Each structure stands twice: as C-alpha cells, then as structure tokens.
Regions:
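Acidic catalytic loop of the alpha/beta-hydrolase fold
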Residues: 222-227, 253-254
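Short alpha-helix in the alpha/beta-hydrolase fold that links the catalytic acid
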Residues: 96, 205, 214, 228-237
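Alpha/beta-hydrolase fold nucleophile elbow
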Residues: 142-155
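Short beta-strand/loop motif that positions the catalytic acidic residue
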Residues: 211-213, 218-220, 224
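Membrane-embedded segments
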Residues: 61-135, 139, 159
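Catalytic histidine-centered segment of alpha/beta-hydrolase-like enzymes
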Residues: 251-261
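Active-site nucleophile loop of the alpha/beta-hydrolase fold
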Residues: 170, 174-184, 201-205, 251
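An N-terminal hydrophobic leader/cap segment in hydrolases
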Residues: 9-57
Length: 275
C-alpha cells in the first residue's frame, strides 16, 4: 500500500475511533431520555377524561416545578409510586390503574416529561423520586399521607425505583423489564464502544440490590430484545429481600402489559401485601 493511501486509511480509522465515541458521549441524553411534554390544554383534557386523577405539583430544591398524577385508592390503601420507561408519558396509566383497584397511584412525570419542567438526568430523577416519596410518606397531620408506599418501575423506571428503595423505606417493589445497570445494557448493544467510560447516567441497580430487603416482584418479557431477561436475572439474584420471578412468555419489551399474566401477577402480589 502506498504511503499516501495508508495515511488516508489511518485518518479515517482515527476519525471513527475518536468521532463515534465522542458523538455517543455528547448525544447520550437523547439516546437515554425521550421526553414527551404536555401542553396546559393537554393536561386539562386528561384531567377531564380521568376525573378521579388529580394533577399535583412539587418544587424541587433547585426550584424546578415537577408534576405527577395522583389517583387515590380506597381508604388506608397503599400508594404505588410509578416510574415509567424512557419514552413513556405516564398519564396513560390513569386508565390502566383501574386494573389494580386496591391501591392508590402516583404517576411521576420525569423532568422534561408530561407537565414537569427541566431536563432529565439520573441524579435529577433520583432526587425527584425522593421528593415525591417524602411528600406522601407516612406522617402526622397530612392529608396526603399513605400508610404504606410501594414503588413500581418499568424499564428505565426500574433504575429510579431501585435507587429510591435503597434510599427510603418502601414496603414493596415491582419491577417490569428491569436491568442490572444501564452500563451493562449499553455495552450489550454497543460492544465496540467503551460504554463504562462514556456513560454519565449509569443507573447501577445491581450494586444497590444486596442492601434492599423489601419484597420484590420482578416481571420480565421472555422476548425482550431491548433489555434481555439475563440483565433482570442478575438484579433478581442479588436482591436481599423476598422475591418472585414472573416470566411473560412470548412478550416483548413494549408489549409486556398486554400479556394476560401481567396484571394478574401484579394484583396477586399487591393483594398478598395487603392481607
């Protein structure tokens, strides 16, 4: 190969080796977080269609105004804090929550999602989860208090739920299509990249699991190509508390909730906690 040709090839290789990781590093928020914002008119329309759901706001320590949907349950019912997937606008759960009528629900809008202000990151999602927990946690003289708090995380939300369970006392944890860490999932999908060096939002649930003693329901989709069940199994095996593994046969990552055993297994778990 002539020296000029070799030089050109080396330049192309250098651009690829440096440029691709740099691009991934700079654009990782767009790859991880896919927020769907709601206008004031859309929020009002949702409120009209789901009259039992209440639009609630809280102010974070940095002044950001964050939003959630509160669907009260029966008197003295546990409250489920719901954290959705990376492209999920959670108001759809106002209709789905009727499938689990024995509990109340708090459907959390991440920053930049729904009616919440700001921009999402691992740290802001974690801080806001604690904010919502503290707002509804058992306390005296509060009309919002719940006697028990459960956390429910789906996909990306599993990382938020696990971290909250590690930082606050929760009475039960439900994880749907969860991962061990965002780093491990990213490395699976991008084996040619040094993901551990590039990723700012690690969501390392695996390191927290051995310190969590709350009962766990782990629901996985056997045909999940986005977060293959092997990642959930590592998290499940590391969990310190009582646990149950529910595989949804033939379900994919985005179709788990359509499986006939999805709500059946969730309700069984919830009812066992209440008995």
């Amino acid at each position: 190969m002539e020296s000029g040709t070799l030089s050109a090839v080396l330049k192309v290789v250098a651009v690829v080796l440096i440029g691709v990781p740099l691009l991934v590093f700079l654009l990782q928020e767009r790859l991880i977080f896919m927020p769907l914002r709601l206008s004031d008119a859309a929020v009002a329309d949702i409120q009209t269609r789901f009259a039992k759901g209440k639009s609630v706001f809280a102010q974070a320590a940095d002044g950001t105004r964050v939003h959630a949907w509160h669907l009260p349950g029966p008197s003295d019912a546990p409250l489920v804090l719901y954290f959705g997937g990376n492209a999920e606008e959670v108001s759809w759960m106002l209709g789905e929550a009727n499938a689990a009528p024995t509990v109340g629900w708090l459907l959390v809008d991440y920053r930049g999602y729904g009616a919440s202000e700001g921009s999402p990151s691992e740290e802001t999602l974690a801080a806001d989860a604690v904010l919502w927990y503290d707002k509804f946690a058992p306390k005296e003289n509060s009309e919002l208090q719940a006697k028990k708090i459960y956390v429910f995380g789906r996909s990306l939300g599993s990382g938020v739920a696990v971290r909250l369970a590690a930082e606050r006392k929760v009475d039960a944890v439900i994880l749907v299509t969860p991962f061990d860490s965002m780093t491990a999932v990213g490395q699976r999908h991008y084996p040619f990249l040094p993901v551990s060096l590039l990723l700012r939002h690690r969501f390392d649930s695996l390191s927290r699991a051995p310190n969590i003693t709350a009962p766990l329901l782990c629901v996985v989709a056997t045909r999940d190509s986005i977060i293959p069940p092997e990642h959930a199994k590592l998290l499940y095996d590391a969990w310190a508390g009582p646990k149950r593994w529910v595989p949804l046969e033939e379900a994919g990552h985005n179709t788990a909730d359509a499986h006939p055993n999805y709500w059946r297994s969730i309700n069984l778990f919830l009812n066992e906690r209440s008995s």
